[in-house]
Amino acid sequence: MNVPVGHLRNVQVLGIDAGGTMTDTFFVDQDGDFVVGKAQSTPQNEALGLIASSEDGLANWGMSLHEALAQLQTGVYSGTAMLNRVVQRKGLKCGLIVNRGMEDFHRMGRAVQSHLGYAYEDRIHLNTHRYDPPLVPRHLTRGVVERTDMIGTQVIPLREDTARDAARDLIAADAEGIVISLLHSYKNPENERRVRDIVLEEVEKSGKKIPVFASADYYPVRKETHRTNTTILEGYAAEPSRQTLSKISNAFKERGTKFDFRVMATHGGTISWKAKELARTIVSGPIGGVIGAKYLGEVLGYKNIACSDIGGTSFDVALITQGEMTIKNDPDMARLVLSLPLVAMDSVGAGAGSFIRLDPYTRAIKLGPDSAGYRVGVCWKESGIETVTISDCHMVLGYLNPDNFLGGAVKLDRQRSVDAIKAQIADPLGLSVEDAAAGVIELLDSDLRDYLRSMISGKGYSPASFVCFSYGGAGPVHTYGYTEGLGFEDVIVPAWAAGFSAFGCAAADFEYRYDKSLDINMPTETPDTDKEKAAATLQAAWEELTKNVLEEFKLNGYSADQVTLQPGYRMQYRGQLNDLEIESPLAQAHTAADWDQLTDAFNATYGRVYAASARSPELGYSVTGAIMRGMVPIPKPKIPKEPEEGETPPESAKIGTRKFYRKKRWVDAQLYHMESLRPGNRVMGPAVIESDATTFVVPDGFETWLDGHRLFHLREV
């Protein structure tokens, strides 16, 4: 929320979303008021984009960067740099130590990894189906003699000479990191930790500085490929990202900050960039938007929310049901299966920068998945882009103001878009330029609408039970298109949609989370003594994980009494394949009555996620994992609340008209300045509401009104 420039303020919190296209910053002052900044991302040196975005936002408050940064108490970063490093396979040169005889399992991977992310037609075509190289090549993989079975019994003792030989080989091969992942070490880590100690001894003897990562220290969870991939990421991608985050933190310290940046983690909390488990920040960017939606929902009383985020490269969707996010425990990213707690999201490679091509054989239009990213499209002359993008279609159809992209910092050329679409799309299809561009947008909106519908209905819900939040820099441009006809209870576009993920970062607690796999199986009719044993096993795991959580906070200057602990567990009905994450109703578990409370909480959650009739307590229960979360609250942004005025927008909000093409005809769309609209104002389509950072399109057949929280409500008329 922008407040008068002369207002004395103390800036406290900075949220950052460094996306592939734009870098958003979100500043919060002592009153909870906030301002959003936006600038093009600078992948070569992220700090440059962050500083430019910060200066853009602070200009609205009449503050200098140095003045604001000196006041800041904390800052949260989210971005995609680590994920991009993994996707492009540009990580550190790592070595891998596994059981002898298992040296090939990493490069073989799980079968699903061979086709993750591919459309069906690409999977079966020899020229389009690529097999990504493993993170660690075979020649940097070594085996040691050792075997621990699935219940944790040492069947073959460790032959330490094989571990020393493996360590020396990898050190001699100039490995920049060494990863150790032995079978079933999550059940009994003794041998794996002994191998770790041997490797550390050999590294010290060599005089080199090589980090060593044992899976038992980082991800003591079942599923060998998932656990190994995730531990490798700590060396392969997290360590280089740690250096990037260090540079960003230092760049801001040189300009006045006195704190270390925190990073948005996959589970929805924030952790220090110095944290041991940094791989869990691999996909921090889109998570911020879901956290922001959850926080906004809590403040305003929305329980069921469909989160939709369109940026320059992707369309990300997540569901919040009854105020809770779903956490996946074994997600896939960059065509790898991983063992990370991840806010459940689905993503499509379709954003404002997505390239548009014609299939040379079928003449069908193909959108993405690759993107122009921060280079926008052909419309930006300096981009060097020659293939048309979605943004070029926006230009042709009159959606965007070529003189107001990023507030005029980037000048776009509509005629370049017209010429490129004519040559690449319109002429080959025998269409006019306008119809070709409109057809692309209709195809994109249809794809996104079907995707959103299937995600909601596939989980057994109806869109009528959900409020849809639309955000991201390109979200408000397409909101009408991908929500039309779905029947949402309400469709909401925040006025700060362009910086919504950064807003979510600013609203996220400082939180560490540790997980551990368990195998507790309890039939229905169980004596109290067995229930007590099960509760004790879970309690022991919680206590072990609590030490890890408190140690992380201690490194960041927080004592145990400042940390709020929240235990959790993963449970399923015996014989079923999928478990659910449950927040424990108890701080500790010791008695049979405690066990019954844990199963009652699971039954209630199961009925909410699926259906009450699907509950099957007669099968008994399995606890598959223990979870411990520790949280320290931070100042959060205040949701604005302004008095509502009349329905008619002030004349000062009108900034002219522009030709707008839809449904095979040109119309004159009324243009509005977003920040000049007042709460209570109602806008009928066709209209385009412009801000420096985003554009909200309201076509004919739709209307929107602005409430006192500066949220636009869109509905069909």
Swiss-Prot record:
Pfam families: Hydant_A_C, Hydant_A_N, Hydantoinase_A. Keywords: ATP-binding, Ligase, Nucleotide-binding. InterPro entries: ACX-like_C (IPR049517), ATPase_NBD (IPR043129), Hydant_A_N (IPR008040), Hydantoinase_A (IPR002821), Oxoprolinase-like (IPR045079). It is an enzyme of class 6 (ligase). One of its GO terms (cellular component) is cytosol. Its cofactor is Fe cation; Mg(2+); Zn(2+). The N-terminus is blocked. Optimum pH is 7.6. One of its GO terms (molecular function) is 5-oxoprolinase (ATP-hydrolyzing) activity. Its EC number is 6.4.1.6. The keyword Nucleotide-binding applies. Catalyzes the carboxylation of acetone to form acetoacetate. Has a reduced activity on butanone, and no activity on 2-pentatone, 3-pentatone, 2-hexanone, chloroacetone, pyruvate, phosphoenolpyruvate, acetaldehyde, propionaldehyde and propylene oxide. PANTHER family: 5-OXOPROLINASE RELATED, HYPOTHETICAL 5-OXOPROLINASE (EUROFUNG)-RELATED. Belongs to the oxoprolinase family. This is Acetone carboxylase beta subunit.
